[in-house]
A protein has these predicted regions:
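Short alpha-helix plus adjacent loop in nuclease-associated cores
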Residues: 152-168
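Acidic, Mg2+-coordinating catalytic module of metal-dependent nucleases/exonucleases
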Residues: 121-128, 132-133, 137-138, 170-232
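Acidic two-metal-ion nuclease catalytic site recognized across multiple nuclease folds
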Residues: 1-30, 199-240
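Non-catalytic, surface-exposed connector residues within folded enzymatic/regulatory domains
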Residues: 103, 146-149, 165-168, 188, ...
């Protein structure tokens, strides 16, 4: 067997093992109640909005939820993006080049972030944005592998599944309409938005429980319904 064939077989095997591990992880969590689950609500700030244009993470934060309560366990790190921060992004999150130039790159925080995420369900608002940036900012690391295989809940989809009639699922709109406290947090900071999203998430879990949805599997089903609503809303906006 030549080396190219061996590499291809190893690649296929690794892909298969990753897919298998993902579904084993999903199935393991499906029957677990939200009460017994540990959640990490994640948020990032970046140098720009397009990961494919070379934009990277400048700040990452996580808020841990246990027993359906926000804990004091937090992750809050400035990150050296190893590239320039756009002026537009600085206007939004107020993180300057000077603040991050001596901070660790995301890959250097690999163990710290991985340990924080271990045995948790990952939550975020437009979470796929954060996941893509983590994978691009720290490729071939344990955290990149972790976020590819972890159970995830996007509060956009969960909110759409519970409140299908809302005209928007933007974080500020949801917090205003659902009376989620935000005044004590700094918006567009990774930690501030993480805490606010955690509060929103707990509200959504409470509303889900009123529909007798109390397992991770049930929450994922609501998210899937919400995702379909999001797709329909986008299609409707394209038509009109």
């Amino acid at each position: 067997m030549n080396s190219r064939q061996e590499r291809e077989e190893i690649l296929v095997k690794n892909i298969f093992n990753n897919i298998k591990a993902y579904f084993v992880n999903i199935n393991r969590h499906k029957k677990i109640t939200t009460q017994k689950s540990i959640f990490v609500v994640l948020d990032t700030e970046t140098t720009g909005l397009d990961v494919n244009e070379g934009h990277r993470i400048v700040s990452i934060a996580g808020t841990k939820i246990k027993n359906l309560k926000i804990t004091n366990e937090i992750l809050d790190e400035l990150v050296n993006p190893e590239c320039q921060i756009s002026e537009r992004s600085i206007e939004i999150h107020h993180i300057t080049q000077e603040q991050v130039e001596n901070k660790p790159a995301l890959k250097e925080l690999d163990n710290k972030i991985y340990n924080f995420l271990e045995d948790t369900v990952l939550v975020g608002h437009n979470l796929n944005f954060d996941i893509k940036f983590i994978i691009k900012s720290a490729p071939y690391t344990t955290i990149a592998h972790r976020v590819k295989n972890i159970v995830t809940i996007d509060t956009i989809y969960l909110a759409a599944g519970i409140y299908p009639h809302f005209k928007s699922y933007e974080l500020s709109f949801l917090c205003e309409n659902l009376k989620i406290q935000t005044e004590d947090q700094t918006r567009h900071s990774a930690l501030g938005d993480s805490v606010i999203t955690a509060r929103l998430f707990l509200h959504l879990l409470e509303e889900a429980s009123k529909k007798n949805v109390t397992t991770i599997g049930g929450i994922l089903h609501l998210c899937q319904q919400g995702k379909q609503i999001q797709i329909l809303m986008k299609d409707f906006n394209k038509i009109h």
